[in-house]
């Protein structure tokens, strides 16, 4: 009972939001900016640019208020960037501060221009999207893709927990798609959500949007130069690409190479491709396959997005728009020991409360919930099951403050790097997040009903 009370109080007491109860004709526009750094500005450790990274924006309104989805082909959030763009968007475009849902695709190979330039390019995308708004309609659909898999695995050969494809593990295959189109049938943009880590190109040490960037480009190529396809990472804290053998093989090669030099990295993870012999023909072959896999994953996911759009039959033109926020405070912990990447018993001490930021953008009957951390997949599945709206989705790495991995309660038994390093005590965060999301949806619905 004590845990339950802590969660409920945390979710209810600290909240803020922007609500609009009015229904009106949907307006929508979209734009994007190339935020790839120039080759000459890349660090010496970089091997160049594999593909370009973008800031993408879809702005929508209903005559009473405006809101937006903004995504970045990058790994982590930036609160300064969010604050700077929000300030200008509210002052110059009339988008209320807090009505923009930002998400980072979490590509582990992303790179962007310097901060000041990134602010300008991001705002440029938002501004151009706002200026291109036209009367529109919106549709929603769900598809499926079997590209993801639970990545926390008890390895019988190692006799311990490790990272690998758990084919029997919990893994939501849903591809959730929001699609905007003008009243005369011109495609405007799409926001699609799928739970899978963007880690295919991580060993290459090249700038890349990984599979999210490839999927977005693939979908955009179908609908024209002005079309914008935003990838939103679902609850992928424990989800990897199912076909990931190139990375596993490269790890084994790197472990063996380090061992020859007298260093044991069998339970460590050097960043990127550090320490790999790129003159080794096998390394070169595997890295070449990784480059192909980026495009393959993007194409296959993009095909499902296109199919879902093609099969949409019902659209709405008059919509309500509600945005709401909560900051949760839940019991935290600090790890006291370290035994490598995985496969050992963690030791912890209690610390003060730690926070999780939650956001809701509710477009008519489509609740898009965002969180600042990397939640495990079962948290999103539970939210969708308990939500009164079938079109509910959960996007991770939203807004500007990163809060780390958030395992579901059941998964704390795993001695995986995500669970070991999590700063959230078992038994609190999962319910706090689900209840906060349901509270925000309730508040949005009641605001629209008044």
Question: What are the functions of these language-model segments?
Answer:
Residues 17-21:
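Sec/Tat signal peptide C-region and signal peptidase I cleavage site
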Residues 22-450:
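Conserved beta-alpha junction segments in alpha/beta enzyme cores
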Residues 1-4:
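Positively charged n-region of N-terminal signal peptides that target proteins for export
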Residues 6-16:
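Bacterial N-terminal signal peptides
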């Amino acid at each position: 009972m004590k845990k339950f009370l802590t969660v409920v109080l945390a979710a209810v007491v600290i909240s803020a939001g922007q609500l609009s109860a009015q229904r009106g004709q949907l307006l929508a526009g979209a734009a994007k900016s190339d935020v790839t750094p120039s080759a000459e500005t890349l660090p010496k450790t970089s091997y160049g640019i594999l593909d370009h990274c973008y800031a993408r924006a879809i702005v929508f309104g209903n005559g009473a208020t405006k809101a937006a989805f903004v995504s970045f082909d990058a790994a982590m959030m930036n609160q300064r960037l969010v604050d700077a763009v929000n300030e200008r968007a509210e002052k110059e475009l009339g988008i209320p501060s807090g009505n923009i849902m930002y998400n980072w695709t979490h590509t582990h190979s992303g790179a962007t221009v310097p901060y000041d330039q990134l602010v300008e390019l991001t705002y440029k995308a938002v501004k151009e999207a706002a200026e291109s708004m036209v009367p529109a309609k919106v549709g929603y659909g769900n598809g499926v893709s079997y590209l993801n898999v639970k990545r926390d695995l008890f390895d019988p050969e190692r006799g311990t927990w490790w990272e690998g494809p758990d084919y029997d593990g919990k893994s939501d295959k849903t591809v959730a798609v929001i699609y905007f189109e003008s009243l005369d049938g011109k495609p405007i943009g799409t926001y699609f959500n799928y739970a899978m880590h963007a880690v295919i190109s991580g060993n290459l040490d090249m700038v890349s949007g990984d599979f999210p960037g490839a999927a977005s480009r693939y979908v955009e190529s179908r609908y024209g130069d002005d079309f914008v396809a935003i990838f939103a990472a679902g609850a992928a804290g424990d989800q990897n690409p199912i076909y990931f053998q190139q990375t596993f093989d490269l790890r084994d090669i790197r472990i063996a190479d380090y061992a020859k030099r007298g260093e044991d990295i069998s339970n460590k993870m050097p960043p990127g491709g550090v320490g790999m012999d790129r003159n080794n023909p096998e390394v070169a072959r595997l890295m070449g396959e990784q480059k192909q896999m980026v495009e393959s994953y993007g194409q296959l996911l993009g095909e499902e997005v296109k199919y879902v759009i093609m099969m949409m039959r019902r659209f709405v033109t008059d919509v309500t728009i509600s945005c709401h926020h909560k900051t949760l405070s839940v019991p935290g912990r600090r790890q006291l020991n370290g035994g490598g990447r995985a496969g050992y018993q963690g030791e912890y001490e209690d610390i003060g409360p730690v926070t999780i930021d939650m956001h809701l953008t509710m477009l008519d009957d489509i609740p898009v919930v965002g969180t600042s951390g990397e939640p495990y997949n079962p948290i999103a599945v539970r939210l969708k099951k308990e939500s009164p709206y079938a079109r509910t989705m959960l996007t991770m790495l939203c807004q500007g403050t990163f809060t780390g991995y958030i395992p579901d309660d059941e998964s704390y038994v795993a001695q995986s790097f995500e669970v070991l390093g999590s700063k959230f005590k078992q038994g609190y965060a999962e319910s706090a997040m689900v209840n906060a999301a349901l509270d925000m949806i309730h508040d949005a619905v009641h605001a629209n009903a008044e």
